[in-house]
A protein has these predicted regions:
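Substrate-binding groove of N-acetylhexosamine-processing glycoside hydrolases
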Residues: 1-176
Length: 176
């Protein structure tokens, strides 16, 4: 009782060429990566198992709240093109701000049958693989961190992209 587990595995498959990704794995790691992939297939069951033992779940799905993703859309500020190319983990699919915002913590994992009771919260992560200074960190955090906060603190029925993007634009001067 009182335990908390983190659920960070994100296994949603998009329209991507997984064989191309496999081709990029160095030969000496292919066997271990195949074992890792097989092991990770069981991860979606983890929250339900934890809940059955009275643990609460912190949702931290890498596909939505891992802030080291490269940006998909171009920056409105052309001086940021070099940062956009350099920063972010290349192994992760590039994503738009909207893609990282549009998820529902209450329906993310079907093994969490009573999310109001069993989800302790959400968590964003950044591992800084490509970050060399504070400016780099800010570039990857903003504006995505604001979306993570809103998803964590608001009822999902109050989080709509068309309304959020207006609020988000108004916050931009605060990040200068």
């Amino acid at each position: 009782e009182g335990d908390v587990i983190q659920h960070w595995i994100y296994l949603k498959q998009k329209n991507e060429d997984s064989s191309k990704k496999k081709d990029n794995i160095p030969a000496e790691y292919k066997e271990i990566m195949a074992l890792f992939a097989e092991f990770m297939k069981e991860a979606p069951k983890d929250p339900g198992l934890g809940i059955s033992k009275k643990a609460k779940v912190i949702l931290s799905p890498s596909g939505y709240v891992y802030l080291d993703h490269k940006y998909l859309e171009p920056s409105a500020d052309s001086t940021q093109n070099a940062e956009q190319e350099r920063l972010g983990m290349a192994a992760y699919e590039k994503q738009t701000i909207q893609e990282m915002y549009d998820w529902d913590p209450m329906t993310f994992n079907p093994t969490v049958e009573n999310p109001q009771k069993d989800v302790a919260g959400i968590e964003a992560a950044i591992w800084c693989e490509t970050i060399t200074n504070f400016r780099d960190l800010q570039f990857l955090l903003m504006p995505r961190l604001a979306g993570v906060a809103e998803k964590g603190w608001s009822k999902v029925e109050n989080t709509h992209w068309d309304e959020y993007k207006v609020r988000l634009g108004a916050q931009a001067p605060l990040w200068e």
